[in-house]
């Protein structure tokens, strides 16, 4: 039996990544080679060009080889280049993300014996267009033929609400990851979940707390004890030392979530090659002092997101926690005292996004072009149905095509629930192969229906696919536009075309007059105007292919549009 929906979801995180699969109405995290649910988003390349991904790569950060990197997600879609010293190779951020995605894909093949052809990949809600494009390219380079993107807060809400019996509720998704922060108000109502509003910061996360521990606590103590000239984080001379300090800070931060005190230790060489060994005791109170400004900053973003939609904290049922830092009790206490809303961490904050991505993947039909070739003599079916919805008697349809059949008069098709043995009864195909049927679905499980096709003589024929699935569950109504988009006019006014927060796709049509003179029959010249998206401006160039003039207005009849962001 081949898959008819994508089913696999990936959380491509700044510090850690994970992959999950939808099985029925439940999700399963696919463990990696180390038998862990999450894989560190770290990549190393040695002098022979061998690539390592995950914990082994992360361990090499401390080796001072210049051959391992982490947190490259923050630079997705930029021109930044990571240089691997031993091999001399240069890699872009999306190329390193490709290696992480390849590793997750290989984990599925090892654990399930299945080659994943398509997968939903999550992105922060605050990711811009160029960052999303870079993520798509990384997925394609990793071997995924289809990779729909899903915003991380939407994924988290789906993981919580897929099988929930919710009439109407507002949830606040609080996603404090390793390197990015997202806050989103979600509305769950009668089987649909959609984003009401969102905000975020692509440079706010657990890594910032780690670096603050390093710079506010560890560095001052080391400078008070040792003679370390120009001992700053930005000094390439001390790159190795600061990598060790950060790793120690991260470990100590995690330890302090369970105990009152922790010891931060490690060793590195000074400017003269002498080994320096540090042993620093850190109390939970000191950690809270360092971490609190970041938690307060994230809470202020949440409050702004609520106020923009005139929602009070009392209107929100719960805060859904996402991200490793939210596992710490002190973190939760500070957050709840700042927001005044109950917290929900019933689904593991480390894997909730991957699980939600898998749920969404179950709503995405697998593109037939990505499926295995149809065997000789078989019939193909282009299914047209929603794999997930709240209707217990959904409609399903499709079109049958065959190796040589053009007229399907006399053909019949029947759908059979493989578990309950419910049957649709034989449905006559139209002459062009089109059919429509009503299904009967059971709650609490993925309903699989065998497709039985019969020719005019009553002989059963093989089909691809040979099943379709339907699950009664919550669906994402629509994903929102991240930032408003509009055109800057010659009089310095701004004409908004598409509204932030509204569902996609959005379309808008405006008639504008150009201040640039255009002659009838003119071609080859360029019209330039400014497209604004949120706080980002872009230059748009329209290359004129053919123009015509009518009275006082100038019209561009045919144009080629290209966008270049500054």
Residue ranges and their predicted role:
Residues 1-75, 82, 87-90, 109-566:
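Oxyanion-binding/catalytic loops of NTP- or PPi-dependent enzymes
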Residues 88-99:
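Conserved AMP-binding/adenylate-forming core of the ANL superfamily
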Residues 101-105:
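Generic structural signal for well-ordered alpha-helices
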């Amino acid at each position: 039996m081949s898959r008819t929906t994508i089913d696999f979801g990936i959380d491509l995180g700044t510090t850690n990544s994970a992959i999950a699969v939808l099985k029925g109405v439940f999700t399963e995290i696919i463990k990696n080679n180390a038998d862990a649910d999450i894989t560190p988003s770290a990549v190393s390349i040695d002098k022979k060009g061998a690539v390592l991904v995950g914990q082994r790569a992360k361990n090499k950060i401390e080796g001072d080889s210049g051959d391992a990197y982490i947190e490259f997600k923050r630079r997705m879609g930029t021109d930044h280049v990571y240089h691997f010293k031993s091999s001399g190779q240069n890699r872009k951020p999306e190329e390193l993300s490709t290696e992480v995605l390849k590793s997750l894909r290989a984990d599925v093949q090892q654990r399930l014996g299945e080659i994943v052809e398509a997968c939903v990949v999550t992105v922060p809600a605050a990711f811009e267009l160029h960052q999303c494009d870079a993520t798509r390219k990384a997925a394609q380079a990793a071997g995924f033929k289809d990779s729909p993107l899903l915003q991380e807060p939407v994924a988290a809400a789906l993981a919580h609400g897929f099988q929930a019996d919710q009439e109407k509720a507002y949830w606040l998704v609080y996603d404090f990851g390793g390197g990015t922060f997202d806050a989103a108000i979600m509305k769950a109502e009668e089987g649909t979940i959609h984003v009401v509003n969102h905000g975020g910061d692509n440079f706010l996360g657990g890594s910032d707390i780690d670096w603050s521990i390093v710079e506010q606590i560890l560095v001052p103590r080391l400078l008070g004890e040792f003679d370390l000239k120009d001992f700053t984080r930005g000094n390439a001379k001390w790159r190795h030392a600061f990598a060790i300090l950060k790793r120690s800070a991260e470990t100590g931060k995690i330890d302090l979530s369970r105990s009152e005190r922790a010891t931060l230790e490690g060793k590195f060489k000074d400017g003269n090659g002498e080994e320096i060994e540090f042993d620093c005791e850190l109390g939970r109170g000191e950690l809270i002092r360092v971490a609190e400004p970041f938690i307060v900053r994230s809470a202020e973003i949440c409050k702004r997101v609520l106020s923009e939609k005139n929602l009070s904290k009392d209107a929100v049922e719960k805060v859904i926690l996402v991200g490793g830092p939210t596992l710490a009790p002190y973190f939760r206490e500070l957050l709840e005292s700042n927001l005044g809303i109950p917290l929900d961490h019933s689904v593991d904050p480390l894997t909730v996004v991957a699980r939600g991505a898998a749920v969404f993947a179950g709503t995405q039909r697998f593109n037939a072009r990505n499926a295995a070739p149809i065997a000789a003599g078989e019939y193909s079916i282009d299914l047209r149905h929603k794999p997930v919805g709240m209707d217990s008697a959904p409609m399903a349809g499709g079109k049958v095509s065959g190796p040589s059949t053009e007229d399907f008069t006399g053909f019949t098709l029947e759908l059979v629930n493989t578990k309950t043995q419910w049957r649709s009864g034989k449905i006559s195909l139209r002459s062009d192969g089109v059919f429509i049927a009503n299904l009967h679905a059971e709650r609490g499980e993925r309903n699989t229906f065998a497709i039985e096709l019969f020719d005019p003589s009553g002989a059963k024929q093989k089909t691809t696919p040979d099943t379709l699935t339907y699950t009664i569950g919550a669906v994402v109504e629509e994903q929102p536009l991240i930032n408003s988009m509009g055109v800057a006019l010659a009089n310095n006014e701004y004409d908004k075309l598409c509204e932030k927060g509204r569902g996609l796709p959005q379309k808008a049509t405006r008639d504008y007059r150009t201040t640039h003179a255009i002659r009838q029959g003119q071609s080859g010249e360029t019209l330039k105007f400014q497209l604004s998206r949120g706080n980002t401006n872009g230059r748009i160039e329209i290359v004129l292919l053919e123009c015509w003039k009518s009275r006082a207005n100038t019209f561009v009849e045919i144009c080629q549009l290209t966008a270049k962001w500054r």
